Design a protein with these regions (language model features):
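Non-heme di-metal
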Residues: 1-63
Length: 63
């Protein structure tokens, strides 16, 4: 990566993927009856969405 913009683009994609996968793990843990671990993965998904929003704001994304 050679520019901040390129770094932010990669960061946005990475955080999107992380939020999706953490959500899937939370669902899997929920279906196994492991509510505590499910809650942790949901929290991690929320953090990923927060990081994604921050990267998008820094990159100048607009809704």
């Amino acid at each position: 990566m050679e520019t901040v913009e390129e770094f932010l683009a990669h960061s946005i994609k990475l955080e999107q993927e992380a939020a999706l996968r953490f959500g899937q793990l939370a669902d899997a843990m929920d279906s196994c009856g492991n509510k505590e671990v499910s809650k942790l993965f949901r929290q991690l998904a929320d953090y990923s969405r927060m990081h994604q929003a921050d990267a998008q704001a820094r990159a100048g994304f607009r809704d």
